[in-house]
Amino acid sequence: MNEYINLTLENIDEEHICCAIGDKKHQAGVDSKKEWIKSKLKDGHIFRKLNARGKIFIEYEPLETAWIPISGKNYEYIYCLWVAGSFKGKGIGKELLEYAINDSKEKGKSGICTLVSKKKKPFIGEKKFFEHYGFKVVDTIGDYELLALQFDDSETPRFNDSARLMKIDNKDFTIYYSPECPYVEYEVNELIEYAKENNIKINFIKIDSLEKAKNAPCIFNNWANFYKGEFL
């Protein structure tokens, strides 16, 4: 039987968070992600991982407090479900998702939802996997789709109006980012240095609050690029 661990205030400092394990260049990002998780646990944030060294985890929380430009009542939102490498094909993804579904039902939720894409994109779940468990498309913006598994007849979640804009007024290259991903901090610092060395103007906008996340001008999980005002 597989052994899983849910991160808590008591164990998070000793546990790894699956991504960037042992990678010193991403340590600052790992530390930021851990602090972010600590701040979110009070909201019901769940980070559940296989007790192993690898990228094998699910991360979700109530949609009302999730840093994503999606709104809905009494739903859980899955940020990420990742099973990588040799752990694939062993039913671990199934166990992680079923845990989240059952946990949501036990909490009296109306359903659970997640972001996918019609086309394969990095760091976004596979649509077919979720559809196998009964998730259905409830809203769409371009190639991006909001999937939901309903437990009752209540209204399904929707993308916020701000996310439907998919554009900004600033015409310079602009990056929106958040501490939700441990890889982000290193990449931002690298881009800042690259921009300085090559005299390129890049605007960096940090999403560091629930309000900013809910009002993001595009589909936003933890990173978004704009150029000449258009979402890339």
Where are these regions (language model features)?
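Conserved GNAT acetyl-CoA-binding A-motif
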Residues: 104-120
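Non-catalytic, surface beta->alpha helical segment in thiol-disulfide oxidoreductase systems
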Residues: 228-232
